[in-house]
């Protein structure tokens, strides 16, 4: 039994190392809709990968990176709220992806459930290697660019005065988030990956007094959620990814109760 669940648990832990800090930046920037936009657009990437018979990871990564670059640029130019643009792109790409998949499924057999909810317990050794390399790469970039990204998140005007390229810092976060989602979507699913990005940092903010502490607590909450969710899946035969999200939501609920009553 241990040999069956350990790869999935380890994959969840490795993903937590990146979703914790990236999710914290998304929460600080109040860009929770950004994660939804990328995860929903991944369905369009999946449809295109099936239609053109290319690797789904590359199709999703290219599409989401393109969307991230466009959004970083549009945020500088558009007079409307970024949330408005995010919602338009999110639902348009989701609808377009579902239409394409519906058209393709008449010729090819497609299991859309795996794309929507993932399968964390199907992780292979090669998957673990890919996730490990990706996590090391993203964490290295975050550590190297931590000051500029954090400064531009807290106050863009002061960051510009200090000579920080705010657009570049914003684009770095968006592209790293796109890369993480492209890696994780196979195991967590398009509909649940945003939850793993947003809920742990939302839980951690009630216990932290500094950005660094919030990131660490978000990672711990995420690892606890992965451990609890996989345990629930093993003992009660529930889907792994939804079980992880439920555990994460439960921890968030507990943190809110603590905030209001203690």
Swiss-Prot record:
Pfam families: ABC-3. Keywords: Cell membrane, Ion transport, Membrane, Transmembrane, Transmembrane helix, Transport, Zinc, Zinc transport. One of its GO terms (cellular component) is ATP-binding cassette (ABC) transporter complex. It is found in: Cell membrane. It is a multi-pass membrane protein. Disulfide bonds: none annotated. The chain crosses the membrane at residues 8-28, 54-74, 84-104, 129-149, 179-199, 215-235, 238-254. One of its GO terms (biological process) is response to zinc ion. Its main location: membrane. Involved in the high-affinity zinc uptake transport system. Belongs to the ABC-3 integral membrane protein family. This is High-affinity zinc uptake system membrane protein ZnuB. It comes from Buchnera aphidicola subsp. Acyrthosiphon pisum (strain APS). The lineage of its organism: Bacteria, Pseudomonadati, Pseudomonadota, Gammaproteobacteria, Enterobacterales.
């Amino acid at each position: 039994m241990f040999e069956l669940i350990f790869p999935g648990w380890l994959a969840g832990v490795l993903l937590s190392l990146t979703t914790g800090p990236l999710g914290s930046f998304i929460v600080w920037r109040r860009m929770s809709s950004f994660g939804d936009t990328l995860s929903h657009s991944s369905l369009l990437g999946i449809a295109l990968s099936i239609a053109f018979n290319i690797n789904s990871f590359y199709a999703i990564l290219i599409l989401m990176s393109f969307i991230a670059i466009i959004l970083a640029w549009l945020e500088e130019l558009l007079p409307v709220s970024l949330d408005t643009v995010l919602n338009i792109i999110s639902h348009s790409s989701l609808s377009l992806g579902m239409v394409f998949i519906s058209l393709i499924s008449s010729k090819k057999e497609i299991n859309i459930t795996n794309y929507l909810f993932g399968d964390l317990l199907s992780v292979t050794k090669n998957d673990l290697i890919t996730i490990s390399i990706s996590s090391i790469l993203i964490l290295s970039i975050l550590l190297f660019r931590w000051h500029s990204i954090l400064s531009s998140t807290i106050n863009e005007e002061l960051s510009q005065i200090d000579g920080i390229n705010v657009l570049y810092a914003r684009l770095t976060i968006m592209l790293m988030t796109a890369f993480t989602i492209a890696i994780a979507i196979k195991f967590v699913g398009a509909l649940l990956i945003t939850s793993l990005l947003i809920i742990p940092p939302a839980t951690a903010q009630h216990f932290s007094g500094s950005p660094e502490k919030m990131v660490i607590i978000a990672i711990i909450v995420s690892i606890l959620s992965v451990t609890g969710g996989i345990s629930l899946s093993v003992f009660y035969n529930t889907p792994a990814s939804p079980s992880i999200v439920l555990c994460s939501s439960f921890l968030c609920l507990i943190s809110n109760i603590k905030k209001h009553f203690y």
